[in-house]
Amino acid sequence: MNHSEALTEQVFSFASELYAYGVREVVISPGSRSTPLALAFEAHPNIKTWIHPDERSAAFFALGLIKGSEKPVAILCTSGTAAANYTPAIAESQISRLPLVVLTSDRPHELRSVGAPQAINQVNMFSNYVNFQFDLPIADGSEHTIDTINYQMQIASQYLYGPHRGPIHFNLPFREPLTPDLDRVDLLTSVTKTLPHYQKSISVDDIKDILQEKNGLIIVGDMQHQAVDQILTYSTIYDLPILADPLSQLRKEKHPNVITTYDLLYRAGLNLEVDYVIRVGKPVISKKLNQWLKKTDAYQIIVQNNDQIDVFPTPPHISYEISANDFFRSLMEEPLVERKKWLQQWQSLEQQARIEISDYLKHATDEAAYVGSLIQKLTKEDTLFVGNSMPIRDVDNLLFDSEASVYANRGANGIDGVVSTALGMAAHKNVILLIGDLSFYHDMNGLLMAKLNELHINIVLVNNNGGGIFSYLPQKRSATKYFERLFGTPTGLNFEYTALLYDFTFKRFDNLTDFKYAELSKMGSHMYEVITNRDENLHQHQNLYQKLSEIVNVTL
């Protein structure tokens, strides 16, 4: 077998194996060394390829594809520093447990560590962030090489589904010439393999006595695409309030037991006596709720369908590595406990807080008012993708009357890659992106994917000319002299030119009334910039906090 035949067999077999284990989309960043696999993916009849020249943005775009399709997605780049640009998105995928398949092309072994161009040490380069990594052998025509690929892919597949989900990395050295035989596309197969299935049963004997206490809470964080119906069923039968993070996807169910205003209530001084807490999914966004969890004496139970439990903000008394639905289904045989008054107390606080928030939004002109207006525009067909810092916190506080799905990059919580991730989701969903100006600036080049692929998206850009969230931190008061330069960081950018560069329509709003009448479009790429003031935003938010403090004090 000559080199061309060996290369063709290897890369076509590798592409077929990825398909067999569920990969249907690949984001390719062009380069020479990645030629063999790029051609294999492009020639595969059932794999969709996306082309993105920026590796950093491409990797985040792939995360959006994963969130939108609920399937593993691969990214492919050439050798050298191109691969290093994947790092931020890999870190996000590891913490968020997203099945990202990282494929880095490499120089052959004889060109490593000898000063050859575009060659860096790529072996195990993502060790801190991936669940699996392997440096594949060079194509040599040996049947053992193909066996190695198949065996390693089988091992890696366990990290694409179930409780072990997360990123995997294959480093693939290729020797020139780099072009496979495209007349042998018959080697590209579309056979699927049996995927790992995970199901666990549990014993709740250790928590039976705890569950008989009256004052229990269910706290649900980001559930990604996990089923949550049994949480609602259990809550209904056992009269337990659910404190639901906006990323839990529970708020859109509009269930009477779902509490959405808890962040504002705890900020206002809420201090109800709680006997036990069942924490489900990823940690919640709310800083105030996390602070309460850290100091409460309540017995804490964590339920996460992961092999590595996220214990933040404080280790639980007991944890269960099982899906939420399986866990709550296991509790259905437990005796009922009278909790009507406990539940009603939470529901009353929720109702009063919602009334106060709604009244506030009638008169406010700050960023929250714009966010509240945006939420009112959303339908159940919409997906709201939210940037970090202030946007996600305003959504956390204000999202209580919408059927839209809500997503964000809340693994590493970075402000980079948000535009690209949202556009990846836009390939599968009707996406509205809510984002701040600094986060938008970080990832403006991600907009290229909308232009190249005619993706439909509405971007609401909240421009307070800097880092608005820092106004809420002690630095605002203790470092006044240096605050604006080090933390406020105004850029003075005119984003209208950005919209023009990437073929987005553009509208700028400097008053809330005009924005309220703006219509979101289901087709095309559109940017809506809202101009806000950081100091005014801080002042109006503090007024809302004060109003809610009065409610909590009167109620308790």
From Swiss-Prot:
Record InterPro entries: MenaQ_synth_MenD (IPR004433), MenD_middle (IPR032264), THDP-binding (IPR029061), Thiamin_PyroP_enz_TPP-bd_dom (IPR012001), TPP_enzyme_TPP-bd (IPR011766)
Necessary cofactors: Mg(2+); Mn(2+); thiamine diphosphate
Keywords of this entry: Magnesium, Manganese, Menaquinone biosynthesis, Metal-binding, Thiamine pyrophosphate, Transferase
Summary of subunit composition and partner proteins: Homodimer.
Pathway(s) served: Quinol/quinone metabolism; 1,4-dihydroxy-2-naphthoate biosynthesis; 1,4-dihydroxy-2-naphthoate from chorismate: step 2/7; Quinol/quinone metabolism; menaquinone biosynthesis
Protein name, UniProt field: 2-succinyl-5-enolpyruvyl-6-hydroxy-3-cyclohexene-1-carboxylate synthase
Swiss-Prot/TrEMBL catalytic activity: isochorismate + 2-oxoglutarate + H(+) = 5-enolpyruvoyl-6-hydroxy-2-succinyl-cyclohex-3-ene-1-carboxylate + CO2
Family from the record: Belongs to the TPP enzyme family. MenD subfamily.
GO MF assignments: 2-succinyl-5-enolpyruvyl-6-hydroxy-3-cyclohexene-1-carboxylic-acid synthase activity; magnesium ion binding; manganese ion binding; thiamine pyrophosphate binding
Protein purpose: Catalyzes the thiamine diphosphate-dependent decarboxylation of 2-oxoglutarate and the subsequent addition of the resulting succinic semialdehyde-thiamine pyrophosphate anion to isochorismate to yield 2-succinyl-5-enolpyruvyl-6-hydroxy-3-cyclohexene-1-carboxylate (SEPHCHC).
Organism: Staphylococcus epidermidis (strain ATCC 12228 / FDA PCI 1200)
EC id: 2.2.1.9
Cofactor note: Binds 1 thiamine pyrophosphate per subunit.
Biological process per Gene Ontology, one example term: menaquinone biosynthetic process
